[in-house]
């Protein structure tokens, strides 16, 4: 939990691969760059960090603060949306429940405008059920969640590191997507590196 943020990662994700590679001389890059997924569950506390997909925002769900105001274009890059949510909370326009702070994903309005949307966004229904809410009646409280380390082991186009015989691919590598990856990075990794 970097800087107190909930995380979508399991507690066993401790960067052991990066440490091992670094100790034998591999170069690391951008290890100070982390991505915060904008729509992680904030309430109830035992689900903090569970992710709600971008598909929910791309379907038309709006983010609203504690005053009921929309405050960001939800389809902006993750870092822009996450920063806007943090600003609303920091400036006192967030929502507080059981000590958790966040904003609302306005699911009631989405479902009222498109009653069949939950048939397409099945995971939204599952997450709402776990939260103990009916998303057609009550909005989901969300907050940015620590999701991904953008940095990692530096590789070339053949997946080779600067250490002879050490090849790396996948989430242990850094720099392929820059400092602010988009969703679906695993697809690019598989297509590019097999």
Predicted regions and their residues:
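Short FAD-binding loop at a beta-strand-to-alpha-helix junction that anchors the flavin cofactor
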Residues: 1, 158-182
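A conserved FAD-binding loop/helix module that cradles the flavin
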Residues: 2-24, 175-194
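Generic recognition of stable, solvent-exposed alpha-helical segments in well-folded globular domains
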Residues: 13-16, 80, 116-126, 145-148, ...
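Short, ordered coil/turn segments that flank beta-strands lining enzyme active or ligand-binding pockets
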Residues: 66-67, 157, 192
């Amino acid at each position: 939990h970097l800087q107190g943020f909930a995380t979508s990662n399991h507690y066993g994700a401790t960067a052991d691969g990066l440490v091992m590679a670094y100790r034998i001389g591999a170069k690391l890059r951008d290890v100070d760059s982390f991505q915060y997924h904008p729509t992680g569950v904030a309430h109830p506390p035992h689900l903090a960090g569970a992710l709600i997909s971008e598909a929910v925002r791309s379907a038309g769900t709006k983010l609203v603060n504690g005053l009921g105001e929309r405050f960001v274009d939800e389809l902006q890059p993750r870092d822009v949306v996450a920063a806007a949510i943090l600003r609303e909370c920091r400036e006192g326009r967030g929502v507080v429940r059981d000590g958790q702070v966040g904003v609302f994903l306005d699911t009631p309005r989405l479902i009222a405008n498109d009653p069949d949307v939950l048939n397409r966004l099945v995971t939204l229904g599952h997450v709402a059920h776990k939260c103990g809410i009916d998303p057609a009646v009550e909005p989901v409280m969300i907050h940015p969640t620590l999701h991904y380390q953008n940095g990692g082991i530096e590789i070339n186009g053949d997946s080779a590191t600067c250490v002879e015989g050490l090849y790396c691919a996948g989430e242990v590598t850094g720099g392929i997507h820059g400092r602010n990856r988009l969703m679906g990075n695993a697809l690019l990794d598989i297509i590019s590196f097999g």
